[in-house]
Swiss-Prot record:
Keywords, sorted A to Z: Acetylation
One MF term in the entry's GO annotations: pseudouridine synthase activity
Residues annotated as catalytic: D67
Entry's family note: Belongs to the pseudouridine synthase RluA family.
Organism of this sequence: Bos taurus
N-acetylmethionine PTM sites in chain numbering: M1
Signal peptide bounds: none
Comp. bias regions, Pro residues: 269-287
An annotated GO BP: enzyme-directed rRNA pseudouridine synthesis
This protein's encoding gene: RPUSD1
Chain positions covered by the region annotation Disordered: 257-292
Protein name: RNA pseudouridylate synthase domain-containing protein 1
Length: 308
C-alpha cells in the first residue's frame, strides 16, 4: 500500500467554497507538535498554498474530524461563511456520512440498527476511550444509533471477517468503533476497542474508511464518494467469498432519498440526507447553551456569528 506523504493528497470534490479530500490512514488532521512531520494541514499547504488563510491557526477550516487511524472523506471550508453553513448542517443533523469497515467474524444479520448508549470510560488507564452504558466506569452515556449493512463475508489473513457499511445517525466519539466492538465484531486493526487474534495481531492499519459524505448547505450540496480501499487488488490479505449486498445499490439509496429542509419541513435544494432502511434519523434536539458556546468558540477565529 502506498504510504502517506506530503505530496500524496487525493481531492475528490472542489468548489469555490469547499474541498473534500480522501484522508490517508494514520495521518493527523493537524497538530501543534513540531515533531509531527505529516499532517493533512501540511498536505493542504503543500498542494494549495494560495488557499491557506493566515488568519486561522492551521490555515484551513476543517468542517469535521476523522480519527488518526481512519481514512476517507473529510471536508474543508475555504472561507468563513462556508464554514458557518457547514457547521449549521452538522448541528441540525442534516449531514449524511457512511463508512466502510472490515469487522471480525461473520455478521449473521444482513441489516441491523445498533443502539447502545455511549459514554466516557472513567476506568483507570482507559480515560481517553468510550464505552457502552452498563460498562463499569461508564460516565454520562448518551443515546447513539448506527445503521449496519453487511456487504460481504470473507477472510482476512485467514481469519473470518465481514465487510460492512456503517451509517452513524448520531455523532458520538468513536461511535462506530465502540458499537462494532459491543456487537462482538470489532473493526479489524482497532487496537483500542478490538482484540488481537492470531497472525493478524498487528495489521498495517485500522480497517475503517469514511466512504460517503453529503453536506447540504443552502448554497450548494457538497457530495463526495471516495474509492473503496477494501478490495483484494489493494490488500491481498482480504479474500471475500460471499456477496450479500452490492455496494453500488446502497450508494444509490443514499443519493436518491430527499433531504429534509428544517426551515420548511419539506425537501431541500439538495438530496439526499436520510439513513439506510431502518427506524430513521432521530430529530435534532434544541441547541443548548453549551452547544451554542461551542459553536461560537469553533467560529471565533473566523469572526462569524451563527444565526439566531
Amino acid at each position: 500500500m502506498e504510504p502517506g506523504s506530503v505530496e500524496n493528497l487525493c481531492v475528490v470534490y472542489r468548489s469555490h467554497d469547499f474541498l473534500v479530500v480522501n484522508k490517508h490512514w494514520d495521518v493527523r488532521i493537524d497538530s501543534k507538535a513540531w515533531r509531527e512531520t505529516l499532517t493533512l494541514q501540511k498536505q493542504l499547504r503543500h498542494r494549495f498554498p494560495e488557499l491557506a488563510d493566515p488568519d486561522t491557526y492551521y490555515g484551513f477550516r476543517f468542517c469535521h474530524q476523522l480519527d488518526f487511524s481512519t481514512s476517507g472523506a473529510l471536508c474543508v471550508a475555504l472561507n468563513k461563511a462556508a464554514a458557518g453553513s457547514a457547521y449549521r448542517c452538522f448541528k441540525d443533523r442534516r449531514v449524511t456520512k457512511a463508512y466502510l469497515a472490515l469487522v471480525r467474524g461473520h455478521v449473521q444479520e444482513s441489516r441491523m440498527t445498533i443502539s447502545y448508549a455511549i459514554g466516557k470510560n472513567s476506568t483507570e488507564g482507559r480515560t481517553h476511550t468510550m464505552c457502552i452504558e452498563g460498562t463499569q466506569g461508564c460516565e454520562n452515556p448518551k443515546p447513539s444509533l448506527t445503521e449496519l449493512v453487511v456487504l460481504e463475508h470473507g477472510l482476512y489473513a485467514g481469519d473470518p471477517v465481514s465487510k460492512v457499511l456503517l451509517q452513524p445517525l448520531t455523532g458520538r466519539t468513536h461511535q462506530l468503533r465502540v458499537h462494532c466492538s459491543a456487537l462482538g465484531h470489532p473493526i479489524v486493526g482497532d487496537l483500542t476497542y478490538g482484540h488481537a487474534l492470531g497472525q493478524e495481531d498487528q495489521p498495517f492499519r485500522m480497517m475503517l474508511h469514511a466512504f460517503y459524505l453529503r453536506i447540504p448547505t443552502s448554497a450548494e450540496c457538497v457530495e463526495a464518494c471516495t474509492p473503496d480501499p477494501f478490495v483484494p487488488s489493494l490488500d491481498a490479505c482480504w479474500s471475500p467469498h460471499t456477496l450479500l449486498q452490492p455496494l453500488d445499490e446502497l450508494v444509490q439509496v443514499l443519493r436518491a432519498a430527499p433531504d429534509p429542509d428544517p426551515s420548511e419541513g419539506g425537501p431541500g435544494p439538495c438530496s439526499p440526507c436520510t439513513p439506510l432502511p431502518g427506524p430513521g434519523r432521530p430529530p435534532p434536539p434544541p441547541e443548548t447553551e453549551v452547544q451554542r458556546a461551542s459553536c461560537l468558540q469553533w467560529l471565533s477565529e473566523w469572526t462569524l456569528e451563527p444565526d439566531n
